[in-house]
Amino acid sequence: MFASTLITLAACGAIQATTLHVSTHVPQTAQAITRDAGLNSATLEIGGLLSWGNGKVYDVARTPTSISQVIVRVAWQPQFYRGRPLPMWMRGKVALVVEGVKAWIDQDPSASGLGLNVLFRYTWTTNRWQPMFLGGAGILYTDEQVPPGETTRNFTPQVGLGLQYLVQDELAIGGEYRFHHLSNKGATETNPGINTHLILFGVSWDR
């Protein structure tokens, strides 16, 4: 009787030890997955950029020009995966980016205007140095015809690459290169577009 009681107590102790081991192990795994998945947590980004670039009007004379811009940016970065993290080289954020643009165009007569860009961007977020690529299009309204003799409304498709550095967890500085095209998409018979190589520098905050 005494021996059977000892065997029963030993079995209960083994089951309890196994239960404790499992209960301490599972939360650690869950924490690791949650921590990795947090690399792509949903955020709202607010930022500002300054840009300048040399361009060329694709008229007969190939007239040189330049474009300067002040940009205010809002980007929504949703979370697209849960649970098991992605491979390291794939970890990043997809963002829908909306930009308000104030632009100045060097021509005769000089022109300025307001515009709106809608872009899609992918940013790799594996460390504090974060490369990105982006592309989209916008529309720009100006106070003078751009180029001269054309229209005051133009479309602005653009693609680019960038690199940002996280100064703090929610604060980043960075730069971009964009190939920027401006034209009226056939609203006039001639429609000479402007191709510009833009360099941008700015700062952003994640919320």
Specify the residue positions occupied by each region the protein language model found.
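Outer-membrane beta-barrel proteins
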Residues: 55-59, 105-110, 142-146, 184-188
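Membrane-embedded beta-strands of outer-membrane beta-barrel proteins
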Residues: 72-74, 116-120, 133, 159-161, ...
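Surface-exposed strand-loop-strand hairpins of Gram-negative outer-membrane beta-barrel proteins
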Residues: 51-71
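Cleavable N-terminal export/targeting peptides
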Residues: 1-38
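Short loop/turn motifs that connect adjacent beta-strands in outer-membrane beta-barrel proteins
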Residues: 26-42, 79-94, 125-130, 167-171
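Transmembrane beta-barrel strands of outer-membrane/channel proteins
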Residues: 42-56, 96-102, 133-139, 175-179
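Outer-membrane beta-barrel "beta-signal"
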Residues: 70-78, 194-207
